[in-house]
Amino acid sequence: MDFLEAQNYLEKVRSQKGIVLGLDTMRHLMAKLNNPQDKVKFIQVAGTNGKGSTAAYLTSILSEAGIKVGRYTSPAVFSSTEQYFACGSCISESEYAKGVTAVAEAAASLDGETPTAFEQETALAFWYFAQKGCELAILEAGLGGDMDATNIVTTTVCSIITSISMDHCRILGNKISEIAAHKAGIIKPGAPVICIEQKEDAMEPIRAAAKAADTPLYEVHRDEVRQIFSDKRESIVFFREFENLHLKMLGSCQPENAALAVQAASVLSRSYPIEKKHIYDGIEKTRWGGRFELHSGSPDIILDGAHNPDGIRRLRESVNQMFGAVPICYVCGVLADKDYEKEIEILFGRASNVFTVTPPSPRAMKSTDLKAAIKKRFSQLKVTSFDSEDGIEKAMEAAVSQNNPVVVCGTLTILARVKEWMKCNNRL
C-alpha cells in the first residue's frame, strides 16, 4: 500500500466496524506482529479532557532530556500522521504506509476476528515505536481505559489521569464514579500514578485502584497551580517549587495540564536523566494544535476542539479571560451523540452571532438541527446555518466579516477544514 491506500484502508475498516471495547482481539493482533509493544516502556494517559495537551507537554520535556520518546494520540485532527510521533518528528507517509501494510496483513491472518480501525491504528503505533527504538512512549487512551486497545501494554512505568467528566456515557456509564473506574483501569502495579484533583466520586475508584496495585498516587491539587500572568502570547504559572513556568499554549485548562506533566517528569526523574532545565524548556516549547489555538488578526480566530460540557465550560472561561466583554462570533458544529443541549446552555449566553455547520462525520448533527436547538434556548440570538458541501468555508467567510473575535468549536472534526480555509485565505 502507498500512503493514500493505507488511509483509505483504515477508513474502510472504520466504516464497517465501529467501537468495540475489549483486549482479546488486540492481543491476538499484536502476537501476529511479534508483540513489538514489549520492546518499549510506556506512560499511559487517560481522562476526559486534557490528555493530548498533557501528553504534548511531557513529550517535550522528555525530548529536552535527550530521551528517545514516542507519542500516540487520537483522533487525528489535521493529518493522519500527526497521531504518531517518535524521536523528534511525526511518522513519514512512507513509514505510515509500510506500517499499515504490516498491520493489515496481520489482521487478515486472524482466524474469525476483524480488528477495528482504532485497534489497527494502535497496532501501528506499537510497530512504529519499536521500529524507531523509543525508550519511552506516551499512550493516550482512546475511550475509557481498562478495555481500551492501548491497555494491552505490560511495561508501563507511569500512569497519568487527567480531568474526568461526563462523556461517552452510553459506553462508560452515567455516573462519574463509573467513568473514573474505567479510566483507573490503566493503573499498573509498580507504575506510579499522577492524577489531577477530581470530584470525590471520581477520586474514590482511582485511589482504590492505586491501592490495589500497591503503587503510589500523586494528586495534583488545583490550588497548587497558580497562573500569575496571561496575555495573547503566553501565561506564567507557579506549581510547587516550579516558579515562572512559561506556557505558550493558551486556555484556562493548560496550567493544570502542564502541572500534571511536571509532576510526572519529577517522578520519572528518579529513573531517567530529567533535570529542572528540561522541564522548564520543555513546557515553554510545547505546542498542540486545536486547543485554544489563537491566530491573531483582524479579527482574531480561536480554534478549539472542545466537545463535551466540561471542555465547553473551560473554553468559555478562556474566551472570557482573553476577550472580556467583547462580543464573540461562533462557528460551531457538533456530533449528535454529544450533550449538545448543555453545551449550548454553557457557551452561547454572550454570543453576538452563531454560524452552525455540519461536521464531516457520520455521527454529525445537521447544521439546521443545531440551529433549532440553539434558537430554542436563546430565541433572540442571531443564528445562521450552512448546509452546503462548502458550508464550513461559507460559515468562516460570514464569521470573519463580522469583525469580532471568531471561536471555532464543538468538535475536532471541523478544525482541519477551517485551517485549510485559513491557509487559502492567508490567515495562518
Predicted regions and their residues:
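Acidic, Mg2+-coordinating active-site environments of NTP-dependent enzymes
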Residues: 110-113, 120, 132-140, 156-245, ...
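Short functional linear segments
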Residues: 1-47, 54, 60-67, 72, ...
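Glycine/aspartate-rich loop-and-adjacent alpha/beta segment that forms the canonical ThDP
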Residues: 412-428
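ATP-dependent carboxylate-amine ligase catalytic core
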Residues: 28-38, 64-154, 172, 200-201
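C-terminal helical cap/extension that packs against the catalytic core
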Residues: 199-218, 232-233, 300-303, 309, ...
